């Protein structure tokens, strides 16, 4: 059943200066609340220039979901943070990844082994999980979340029950744990996993105009929730990727962004900086390139304020030769996280031009359940004295 079209109603005119003042106050408030970190300095400090902002809709197109799990794991270690995970897949896969991610972060922080398990249970208690099977299920969860947000606005109002069940690992075990947020608190992070599966089901069951209209309304609803809920949540949507050399990609007939093979050039906002446009040579086929791009292309991008792409590439030139050759050696890969689209720019607390993060990238890898810099930090040895021939030179007094 298609989403009902909203009926227009008269609105009183509002001066643009008032709207700008309200938006400035909102962005300053979000900046004071702080960013969500991935615990990887290359991504937080260089690529994102601080971290993931609250009150934004962020998309991650990746071959793996370790990056999103790292963001969620790190956020759950902060006090009074709650998360809502919406997934069309079995819950066990997400729970195992989340448990391992939280445990890895605690071990990295130096938490005693005996205190890791109670802290992991306390973190999982702050996660709500909703399993949906299609886009209608996603709409129901978001609608219930919106109703709870409106009910919590009046002072003294009673909040309805949560739309999703909380994860309870073990209610019998007791252990020290940090203070948990109230049970009726809205989530600080809304994570939607395997979004390409929901899009595939949507375009398979509905006509294309109706599907696009549904997604347009979904984009408005996601932005409304990220900006209107009291918690100003970060909405993180996980999307898959396709490549020109992937024989098991989504069905081209139902794929809105199937530009490969049709001669249509790829939109610049979807192209990785590591996948330049093919050479305009008649008959030239770049068989050695692996052109990774987000699934559903611009259809997915219309939902987002910030779009990240995570691609696996060979670690070194030697690994690239091994990957392209037929040798029995195993090539090493790293994951490159880059910003494809930064619709709003980074708010710095003042008017004027905002820093744009497009085409910023970092090479990372998963090490022990954590996302870390792939090449590490190299410390340069301090030169205390420079000697030259005949004793001349050296540090000046």
Q: In which residue ranges do the predicted regions lie?
A:
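Amphipathic alpha-helical interface elements that mediate macromolecular binding in regulatory proteins
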Residues: 41, 70, 96, 125, ...
